């Protein structure tokens, strides 16, 4: 029997606890926030998700929303806005949202930027490099890398990017597929046929030897070719075959191996991505690629012992840099912030 679900979402503080008697006890949440969520569910159409204004503000940019106007809600003096969730948006992280709203001044990272520039020059000279930007949350890992890759693009150096996300640990190869989608120039709206065509065009341009492995790459991207399915082989052998192909691409003379590859937030990588990351790291030394990875201090991996790996720890911003941020945000009057006690790891 076909059925559809409707969902209502609201955000805010609630009271939680056990409610009932000795015969029946439930753990539940109560309060106005819960009531408004129930109201959103009641007005949602079948198969739709309806959001309150508060929730809509929290997910702005992460999802595409349709403004449905105001409705009258029992217990609320004024009509409330409600929204329909239509599709996934372009934002994936807080940094994406900050960039869309306008970033603060980039200060206090001259030493780190110089280290990345030096690693890039070594890589372009034929000694591939791996640089690990490590720091606690909020120290500016993403901002440093964003500034660096923009400089690279200004010099017409190709950049491939992939990023781990907290909710993506259960999705195999999510950050790696993001990186390779950029390599094959696959868009979000490309269907299976277009995706297969772009992969085949790029690989066969490099050589006919890739034709026999196309079915495996199609499978990796979730677009198997019904007319030419991949052979049934052991999963471990299949993984080795795919890793071998991707490693071969990085070493292929037909591949213009002078990319900057940026993989962010390794601490949120799934197991399959971690395994492939090790393959990528091992592929770097004999290329002209610069691989930059970012992670928090608790992340560790065996490949960090490689001689071509360079850690780049981010130290807290010094007071002069902090005051530079304040001047950018608050203006030049030092009296307005002279007596502030400042943390040195602002989210920028």
Annotate each language-model stretch with its function.
Residues 1-17, 27, 31-340:
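Key residue(s) within conserved catalytic/signature motifs
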Residues 339-348:
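Single conserved hydrophobic/aromatic residue that forms the stacking wall/gate
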């Amino acid at each position: 029997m076909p059925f559809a679900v409707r969902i209502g979402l609201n955000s805010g503080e609630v009271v939680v606890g056990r409610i009932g008697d000795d015969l029946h006890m439930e753990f539940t949440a109560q309060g106005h926030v819960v009531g408004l969520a129930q109201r959103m569910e009641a007005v949602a159409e079948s198969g739709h998700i309806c959001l309150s204004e508060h929730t809509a503000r929290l997910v702005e940019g992460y999802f595409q929303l349709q403004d449905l106007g105001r409705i009258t809600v029992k217990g609320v003096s004024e009509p409330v806005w409600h929204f329909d969730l239509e599709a996934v948006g372009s934002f994936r992280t807080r940094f994406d949202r900050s960039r869309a709203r306008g970033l603060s001044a980039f200060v206090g990272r001259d030493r780190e930027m110089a280290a990345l520039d030096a690693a890039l020059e070594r890589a372009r000279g034929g000694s591939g490099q791996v640089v690990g930007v490590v720091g606690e949350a909020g120290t500016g890992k993403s901002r440093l890398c964003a500034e660096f890759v923009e400089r690279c693009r200004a010099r017409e150096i190709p950049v491939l990017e992939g990023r781990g996300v907290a909710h993506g640990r259960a999705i195999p190869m999510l950050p790696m597929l993001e990186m390779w989608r950029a390599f094959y120039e696959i868009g979000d709206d490309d269907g299976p046929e277009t995706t297969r065509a772009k992969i085949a065009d790029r690989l066969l341009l490099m050589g006919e030897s890739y034709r026999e492995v196309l079915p495996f790459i199609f499978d990796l991207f979730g677009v198997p070719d019904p007319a030419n399915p991949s052979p049934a082989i052991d999963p471990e052998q299949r993984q080795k075959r795919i890793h071998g192909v991707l490693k071969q691409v990085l070493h292929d003379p037909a591949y213009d191996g002078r990319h900057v590859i940026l993989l962010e937030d390794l601490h949120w990588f799934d197991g399959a991505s971690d395994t492939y990351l090790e393959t990528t790291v091992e592929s770097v030394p004999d290329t002209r690629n610069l691989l930059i990875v970012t992670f928090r201090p608790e992340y560790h991996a065996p490949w960090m012992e490689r001689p071509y790996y360079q850690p780049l720890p981010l130290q807290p911003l010094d007071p002069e840099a902090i005051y530079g941020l304040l001047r950018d945000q608050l203006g030049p009057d030092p009296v307005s912030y002279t007596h502030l006690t400042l943390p040195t790891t602002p989210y920028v």
